[in-house]
Amino acid sequence: VEKEVIHLKKGFLMPYPVVHVLFFLFCIGAVAIYAITGPLSRRELSFRDARKLLLLAFVGGLCTLFPDIMVVYNIVINRTLEHCSVGSIPTHSLLFSSTAILFGGLVGYAAYREFSKAVHMAIFAESAFLTHLLLDDIAEGGCEYLYPLYSRPISVFSIMDTGFAEAGSLFHYLAASVVSVFCVFIVILMALFALNKFGFDFVYRKEK
């Protein structure tokens, strides 16, 4: 029993959930934070604006923790920190990310009663979920992204260590170099695309 309690305490001291939330809000959402600093300093944000920002932070912060959601059940019922699967389905997979899409869509529709905004909130929630997988990929060396099509862990970041000789050709070397960066690019682009629907107008302004 003492060993189980110590194991649980060690698990709770691990900062991973905090890191996942902060990474999404302050790294992926850095442009959005920059966009509101001006209106915030000029006190131009209304209560409605503040409520919208809090809703986005809530959806993003919660959905980035969805891959580890089973840890709550296992701590209470099984007294373990197991959190990587629901039955045979790995939670760190694109298949399980459908839970974030569904949650984001339902919250978006409940808040705005508009299908378009519900879709954009779902995309925003999905981008939050995917940042969790990318961080775990870096830390643990892979996730089961393609389950059930491919059940073994895949690491998009380990591909960066592929040398020219290992790649076998210039094309394969360039492709391996681009993959991990492209995955991060797509996740950031999804978040920015979704935020554009909620008042964050990211446009290029020509110099006068």
Language model regions located:
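N-terminal membrane-targeting hydrophobic helices
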Residues: 1-208
